[in-house]
Amino acid sequence: MLSHLIGILFNPSEEWKKIRDVECTIGKCYCGYVFIMAAIAPVCGYFGTTMFGWEIGAREAVKLSSDSALIIAIAYYFVMLVGVFSMGAMIHWMGKTYNSEQNLSRSVRLAAFTATPLFLVGFVELFPILWLNFVLGLPALAYSVKLLYTGVPIMMEIDEDRGFLFSSSILAVGMVALIVMLVATAILWFNGFAPQFVD
């Protein structure tokens, strides 16, 4: 599945057709792509926050303890794995509304490859500088949205108009999920689950 990485970034329309035509179970998709790609941000984030620390403005860098960073990295990885499957399941469920009867495996592939730019921008977490993550994160998010709108009509085998509406619905669900995650993180942070910092 990693063989589709370059194509999905530089020639998405053609690559989506190849991804659509690949017979791939959810397990194979995860083993060949999601498990690897989803590990980039947690691993880089672990080393970035323990070795260099977060830099916010002109303040001194803030490092996390190894134990605290490890717990966050594992939780981060788990959330990403669950997130890809959840989005795939939601795409599969919503597909009937748009006259798309594709299987769950194809929906999960759509979710996984749409997230490719977001997976790759995880390398920036090796250098946890707030403005740098923000500046590079926004284009990655924008390109993921482009991949979504390009991929839905091809993967779900529906016309462009329904594909646009379907993509917009998926995007709305994704934004709601992101807000829920941020709120949950804030609640945990202020209820005794804040990370441990070191000097």
Where are the language model's segments positioned?
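Selected alpha-helical membrane-embedding segments in polytopic membrane proteins
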Residues: 1-99
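Generic preference for flexible, low-structure residues
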Residues: 21, 32, 46-47, 51, ...
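Residue-identity detector for threonine
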Residues: 25, 49-50, 97, 114-116, ...
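Membrane-helix interface segments in multi-pass membrane proteins
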Residues: 44-79, 125-140, 180-199
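Juxtamembrane, membrane-proximal amphipathic segments and lipid-exposed surfaces
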Residues: 38, 42-45, 109, 153-154, ...
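Alpha-helical transmembrane segments
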Residues: 5, 83-87, 141, 145, ...
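Hydrophobic alpha-helical transmembrane segments and adjacent short intramembrane/lumenal linkers
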Residues: 91-92, 98-173, 178-179
